[in-house]
UniProtKB/Swiss-Prot annotation:
Catalysis: reaction(s): XMP + diphosphate = xanthine + 5-phospho-alpha-D-ribose 1-diphosphate
Name of the gene encoding the protein in the UniProt record: xpt
UniProtKB keywords: Cytoplasm, Glycosyltransferase, Purine salvage, Transferase
UniProt subunit comment: Homodimer.
One of the GO BP terms on file: purine ribonucleoside salvage
Lineage: Bacteria, Pseudomonadati, Pseudomonadota, Gammaproteobacteria, Pseudomonadales
Predominant location category: cytoplasm
Assigned protein family: Belongs to the purine/pyrimidine phosphoribosyltransferase family. Xpt subfamily.
Record-linked InterPro entries: PRibTrfase_dom, PRTase-like, Pur/Pyrimidine_PRTase, Xanthine_PRibTrfase
Pathway noted in the entry: Purine metabolism; XMP biosynthesis via salvage pathway; XMP from xanthine: step 1/1
Name of the protein: Xanthine phosphoribosyltransferase
Amino acid sequence: MEQLKRKIREHGSVLSEQVLKVDAFLNHQVDPQLMRQIGQEFARRFRDQEIDKVITLETSGIAPALMTALELDVPLVFARKHRSLTLTDDLLTARVYSFTKQVESTVAISASHLAAGERILIVDDFLANGQAALGLAAIVRQAGARLVGIGIVIEKSFQPGRRALEEQGYRVESLARIASLAGSQVSFVE
């Protein structure tokens, strides 16, 4: 997706050979026009899958996932990383390791929000090692629902996430695939 690549080049910041900072438009300050385009593109790529719901992880996945759900005219459900007073009984949970934050947490979705047989699309901001998507996939399985695809805004293709997901048989669609962050330069998979 050329608009996204342009935004990454112009407003992204390479912090190391492993970390790309995109808080100017994706995961702190959000560019609503870009999110609309991202939602439209994911909807175009997955429209044939007859999706019932979009799921993501709080917080950074919410903006692109919401716009995708809006375009597909389906509900969005986001997994919570922290329990609240209202998130109590009948939880579907998975352990997820965050590459960026270097912490493991338990994420949860209320069982009442995912039903057996529903067709689910995961949308997330980044793909590195694939742990977030694998955790969400485990929650989908617990619900007896069917994961029909995974939409990733930015994939770090030099990390093993895509391979881990594809080995499980999941369809992965990434809007920007980064080949390298070496030398503080972003290079894309062409």
